Amino acid sequence: GILSEIRMPPPDTPESLHLQIESIKLAFEDAFTYISDPRFREIPIEELLSEERLERRRALIGKEAYVPKVDMVKEFGTVYLATADKEGNMVSFIQSNFTGFGSGLVVPETGIALHNRGYSFSLDPQSPNFLEPGKRPYHTIIPGFLMKDGKPIGPFGVMGAFMQPQGNLQVLCRI
């Protein structure tokens, strides 16, 4: 990705945090521009991950803060849970109602409030998240699971809406 060709300083240094923050801003700029339900819009994955494009994006990381050309979204609430047992079963779970009490709908006899991720749709026909029947909206729910050599190491994750990719990166930098 964007950081793959950059020699990272130790994780808690200002230099490392700057590189992480700037790379996440670039990644979110791409996310808000391209991520959509692939059943409704072609996503140029090969081009987005091409070394030539990554190099162009990487070149935008300088000493000064990069200002994304898309609007960033407000913060909301989430809960994350990771668990494992002695038999090797593992779960990485994230639940987010997104805003307030989510959709305001509760499953009868359970008290479980349903989320309102449909809020992330756009009415702009040019948006990758333009509202269409059966389409899934872009969201920030990222339960992580770490693998090595095809074998599970364990679940991981963080809360924090658009901080999640950066938080996951910070966790992985410390493993």
Q: What is the predicted role of each segment?
A:
Residues 5-97, 109-110, 117:
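Internal maturation/activation junctions in enzymes
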Residues 159:
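Short acidic/histidine-rich active-site segments
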Residues 6, 174-175:
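Alpha-helix C-capping/helix-to-loop hinge sites
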Residues 1-3:
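Mobile "lid/hinge" segments at catalytic clefts and subdomain interfaces of large enzymes
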Residues 14-18, 162-166, 175:
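Soluble non-cytosolic domains of exported or imported proteins
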Residues 89-154, 162, 170-173:
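Active-site rim segments in enzyme catalytic domains, especially the processed small/beta chain
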